[in-house]
């Protein structure tokens, strides 16, 4: 069910920041974003519950928390401006909400890149039913 939901979001959210975030992930990790992170652990992908399974999953947990602080726009559909400069992601929007969304995505992509060595194929396509431990607070 989670796979179908993510596929639907991919098709519906073509104009949203999904592809912007995916591009950041590819640049920072060298991994294909959808295949590697769309259904990973308890937090990478749509929604999340339980305890993050590893450092990679924790990056996604923190990203979810960051999105929770965004006001005045939908972070999953907001389109922002950014660039890649000298190996870094630079968010360039003057709109505070869009800049915040970009900074959330930037921080998560950097985190995933810094923790690419913790990536565990056992958490790919991880069933949310395994995420039963009490969720941490943001």
Swiss-Prot record:
Negative results: does not provoke hemorrhage. The active site is at 63, 105. This is Acidic phospholipase A2 daboiatoxin A chain. It is found in: Secreted. Belongs to the phospholipase A2 family. Group II subfamily. D49 sub-subfamily. One of its GO terms (cellular component) is extracellular region. It comes from Daboia siamensis. SUPFAM superfamilies: Phospholipase A2, PLA2. Heterodimer of A and B chain; non-covalently linked. The acidic protein (B chain) has phospholipase A2 activity and the A chain weakly inhibits the B chain enzymatic activity but potentiates its lethal potency. It comes from the Eukaryota. Its EC number is 3.1.1.4. Binds 1 Ca(2+) ion. Residues 1-16 form the signal peptide. InterPro entries: PLipase_A2 (IPR001211), PLipase_A2_Asp_AS (IPR033112), PLipase_A2_dom (IPR016090), PLipase_A2_dom_sf (IPR036444), PLipase_A2_His_AS (IPR033113).
């Amino acid at each position: 069910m989670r796979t179908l939901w993510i596929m639907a979001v991919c098709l519906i959210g073509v104009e949203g920041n999904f592809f912007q975030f995916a591009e950041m992930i590819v640049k920072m990790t060298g991994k294909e974003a959808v295949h590697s992170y769309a259904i990973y652990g308890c937090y990478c992908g749509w929604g999340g519950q339980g305890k993050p399974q590893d450092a990679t999953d924790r990056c996604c947990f923190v990203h979810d928390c960051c999105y929770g602080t965004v006001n005045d726009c939908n972070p999953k559909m907001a389109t922002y401006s950014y660039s890649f400069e000298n190996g870094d992601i630079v968010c360039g929007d003057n709109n505070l909400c869009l800049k915040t969304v970009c900074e959330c995505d930037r921080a998560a992509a950097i985190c995933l890149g810094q923790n690419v060595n913790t990536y565990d194929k056992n958490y790919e396509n991880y069933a949310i039913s395994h995420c039963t431990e009490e969720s941490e607070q943001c």
